[in-house]
């Protein structure tokens, strides 16, 4: 694919806040998906002291064609990671934290218990901080959804990543309907937890396929949808088939809103945790507004 269009380009990070965040993460020996996945928004986010911490090590057991995270034999599980994560949240003064992880197919529960321990430690030291987790699919990990649901994150995010027709080439280790099932099960087990999912475009999908994914996610009771442009991390990854224009993203956002999502974020640089703190506040407000509208409708019907 030709060079990136102007609407994709971002400024190189150079603020003192960016380097302060970088130093803190390094000193606490934490991994971030911002660095590992070569996120284009790292400069903006770290300058605001926002970082998405990646737990369960830095090596993934899968090799998705879109992802820049290292693959191979995973690290040993670090029992002290939840405490270090909680310390970082406290030192950064985060009001909202996003926690993600590599896939850990080697673990009996896929790392679900470790996620729960991280949530618990943050609740102890920063009880007013809201917690969003972005998890792997826990494929063939019985009981993992229950562990996560019982931990009660404020937001549960699991990305379907792409349309089902591209799974064999882009996300070969995953199963589309397993991802939908996980999202549905979390909402069923903990209805009060907001659910969220995201996908990339520009991999060769058809618009009709993207719309079908929207319908599938709403069927799974997903509250929040994110859609962003796929960017090729290295020449060894899947090539960009198309750079979707900002106007096309606006169209996708309009269509998604008609499906009934509480929140939709769709733009070239949208990523799962981009502006997550601000979006969470909007998500809560949209929920309150919809709930009030539903109550009014019920009252009118009764009267």
Curated annotation (Swiss-Prot):
SUPFAM superfamilies: Radical SAM enzymes. Binds 2 [4Fe-4S] clusters per subunit. One cluster is coordinated with 3 cysteines and an exchangeable S-adenosyl-L-methionine. It is found in: Cytoplasm. [4Fe-4S] cluster 1 binds at residues 34, 39, 45, 273. [4Fe-4S] cluster 2 binds at residues 60, 64, 67. Residues 46-262 form the Radical SAM core domain. Its EC number is 2.8.1.8. It catalyses: [[Fe-S] cluster scaffold protein carrying a second [4Fe-4S](2+) cluster] + N(6)-octanoyl-L-lysyl-[protein] + 2 oxidized [2Fe-2S]-[ferredoxin] + 2 S-adenosyl-L-methionine + 4 H(+) = [[Fe-S] cluster scaffold protein] + N(6)-[(R)-dihydrolipoyl]-L-lysyl-[protein] + 4 Fe(3+) + 2 hydrogen sulfide + 2 5'-deoxyadenosine + 2 L-methionine + 2 reduced [2Fe-2S]-[ferredoxin]. PANTHER family: LIPOYL SYNTHASE, LIPOYL SYNTHASE, MITOCHONDRIAL. Belongs to the radical SAM superfamily. Lipoyl synthase family. NCBIfam families: lipA, PRK05481.1, PRK12928.1. This is Lipoyl synthase. It comes from Rickettsia bellii (strain OSU 85-389).
């Amino acid at each position: 694919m030709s060079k990136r269009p102007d609407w994709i380009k971002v400024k190189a990070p150079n603020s003192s806040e960016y380097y302060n965040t970088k130093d803190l993460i390094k000193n606490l020996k934490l991994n971030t998906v911002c660095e590992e996945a070569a996120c284009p928004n790292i400069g903006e986010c770290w300058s605001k002291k926002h970082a998405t911490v990646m737990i369960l090590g830095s090596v993934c057991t899968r090799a998705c064609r879109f992802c820049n995270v290292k693959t191979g034999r995973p690290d040993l599980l670090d029992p002290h990671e939840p405490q270090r994560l909680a310390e970082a949240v406290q030192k950064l003064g985060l009001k909202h934290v996003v926690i993600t992880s590599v896939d850990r197919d080697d673990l009996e529960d896929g790392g679900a218990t470790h996620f729960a321990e991280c949530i618990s430690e943050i609740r102890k030291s920063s009880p007013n901080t809201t917690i969003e987790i972005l998890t792997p699919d826990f494929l063939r990990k019985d009981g993992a959804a229950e562990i996560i649901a019982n931990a009660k994150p404020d937001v549960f995010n699991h990305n379907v990543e792409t349309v089902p027709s591209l799974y064999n080439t882009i996300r070969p280790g995953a199963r589309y309907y397993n991802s939908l099932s996980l999202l549905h099960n979390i909402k069923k087990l903990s209805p009060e937890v907001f659910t969220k999912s995201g996908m990339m475009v520009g991999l060769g999908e058809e618009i009709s396929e993207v719309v079908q994914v929207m319908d599938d996610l709403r069927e799974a009771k997903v509250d929040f949808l994110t859609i962003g442009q796929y960017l090729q991390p290295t020449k060894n990854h899947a090539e960009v088939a198309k750079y979707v224009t900002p106007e096309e993203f606006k169209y996708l956002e309009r269509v998604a809103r008609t499906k009934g999502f509480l929140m939709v974020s769709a733009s070239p640089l949208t990523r799962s945790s981009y502006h997550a703190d601000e979006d969470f506040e909007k998500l809560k407000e949209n929920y309150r507004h919809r709930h009030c509208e539903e109550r009014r409708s019920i009252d009118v019907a009764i009267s």
